[in-house]
Every structure is written in structure tokens, then in C-alpha cells.
């Protein structure tokens, strides 16, 4: 009887130890484009993949992008409304009904990203052209981003101003 009890107890212990290990998300380490890809290219790919898998909640999308292995800073997200937005000077950005800004917790990294859900009043391409025409890569006084990128999937627009590679 003691052997059966000991065997049962050890099996329960093994089961408890192995059952507590959670699965890691497959999407948190997406760096598919290649070793020489820029940070913007990596995030565009990640965005397209997540959006094509049905992720439409902007905050969840932004947090997923910040979890990408290519990002080497602690990031934060915050909702934005149509109007004046950081990185676009005095241009009022309209044409969306939901928006999320994401970027580093400490702004010494020249990175800022936005996700916009378009409201249907503007064409996707025209909205992205307006963003690119008004974006200022030196929005942050001490640093400047190297590139900007815009991408669209299912009425959601990603816009990023970033260094070529994380850590620069």
C-alpha cells in the first residue's frame, strides 16, 4: 500500500511540475524578413501577419509589435484621438475612429509607432500619403529616426518612424 501511495504521489508531483509550464506565443519572436532587414521592415511583416490572422484590437496589435524580438526597449501604448499627434508637426491627422501610439518608455530611442483604424471617410492610400507627407523624422529634439514606413491591412494602418536597426 505504501508503494502505491508513493507511486501515486510521485506521479502527481511530476504532473504538477510539467503542467505549470505555459506555452510561449509563436508570434512573439517574428523576425522573418532576413538578417539585413530594417526595424521598420520587420515590424511591417509582423503587423501584416498578425492582422491577417484576425487580430483587430489596436492595443493588442501594438503590444504584440512591441513584443517582437527586434524591439530592444521597454515599450508602452496609449490611445490617441484625431487631431495633433506627436511626430506630425502642426498637421491635424484625421480620418480614423480609433488610434494607438506605441513606443519606448524612455524617449531616447528615435522610435514612434501608430496604429489607426480608418473611419471610412478617407482612402487608405491617401491617409498613408498624408502621414508620410507630414511626418518629421526629428520630432524628438535630441534624436532622429532614420526611416518611416506605412502599411495597411483591413482598414488598419501601421505607421512607424524608427532607426534602421534596434539599438541605434
Locate predicted features.
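Positively charged n-region of N-terminal signal peptides that target proteins for export
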Residues: 1-4, 8-11
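C-terminal motif of bacterial Sec signal peptides marking the signal peptidase cleavage site
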Residues: 15-19
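Mature, Sec-exported extracytoplasmic domains of Gram-positive
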Residues: 21-168
Amino acid at each position: 500500500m505504501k508503494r502505491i501511495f508513493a507511486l501515486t504521489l510521485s506521479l502527481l508531483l511530476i504532473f504538477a511540475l510539467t503542467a505549470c509550464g505555459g506555452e510561449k506565443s509563436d508570434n512573439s519572436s517574428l523576425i522573418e524578413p532576413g538578417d539585413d532587414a530594417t526595424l521598420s521592415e520587420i515590424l511591417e511583416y509582423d503587423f501584416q501577419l498578425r492582422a491577417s490572422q484576425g487580430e483587430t484590437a489596436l492595443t493588442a496589435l501594438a503590444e504584440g509589435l512591441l513584443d517582437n524580438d527586434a524591439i530592444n526597449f521597454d515599450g508602452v501604448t496609449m490611445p490617441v484621438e484625431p487631431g495633433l499627434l506627436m511626430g506630425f508637426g502642426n498637421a491635424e491627422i484625421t480620418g480614423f475612429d480609433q488610434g494607438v501610439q506605441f513606443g519606448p518608455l524612455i524617449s531616447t530611442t528615435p522610435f514612434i509607432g501608430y496604429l489607426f483604424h480608418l473611419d471610412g471617410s478617407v482612402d487608405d492610400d491617401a491617409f498613408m500619403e498624408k502621414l508620410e507627407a507630414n511626418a518629421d523624422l526629428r520630432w524628438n529634439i535630441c534624436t532622429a529616426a532614420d526611416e518611416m514606413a506605412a502599411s495597411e491591412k483591413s482598414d488598419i494602418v501601421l505607421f512607424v518612424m524608427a532607426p534602421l536597426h534596434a539599438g541605434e
